[in-house]
Swiss-Prot record:
Gene3D superfamilies (alphabetical): Helix hairpin bin
Name the record gives this protein: Alpha-synuclein
Keyword Cell inner membrane part of the UniProt annotation: no
Listed GO CC annotations: axon terminus; cytosol; extracellular space; membrane; neuronal cell body; nucleus
Length: 140
């Protein structure tokens, strides 16, 4: 019985030592995980901010190729696109709400397309006649 108790005592010491090592390992792993999550979060934030600015810039470039009658609609779509991307960024916590509506230079993005000159020499897009279209009825 003495041998049995001595064996259990040794096992208990081993478990205590393993638990202590595990506790240290878990604490270290938690610290590294936190660092990793913060790094990914900061990189994602940079990507979201850059992405929103890129969407606005590309939309602005495309508007210069569009006739004057369509500019108003495209401007509204571009503004809603930027607002939507900003809302997603704010909702996910990657961008603070007070950072929304500012581009990388710190100027507001509102009105970015309104001051843009429109080239009157661009050909306007003409809608095709409705004769070539068929009514679509979805299947039940």
């Amino acid at each position: 019985m003495d041998v049995f108790m001595k064996g259990l005592s040794k096992a208990k010491e081993g478990v205590v030592a393993a638990a202590e090592k595990t506790k240290q390992g878990v604490a270290e792993a938690a610290g590294k995980t936190k660092e990793g999550v913060l790094y990914v979060g900061s990189k994602t934030k940079e990507g979201v901010v850059h992405g929103v600015a890129t969407v606005a810039e590309k939309t602005k470039e495309q508007v210069t190729n569009v006739g004057g009658a369509v500019v108003t609609g495209v401007t509204a779509v571009a503004q809603k696109t930027v607002e939507g991307a900003g809302s997603i960024a704010a909702a996910t916590g990657f961008v603070k709400k007070d950072q929304l509506g500012k581009n990388e230079e710190g100027a507001t993005q509102e009105g970015i397309l309104e001051d843009m000159p429109v080239d009157p020499d661009n050909e306007a897009y003409e809608m095709p006649s409705e004769e070539g279209y068929q009514d679509y009825e979805p299947e039940a």
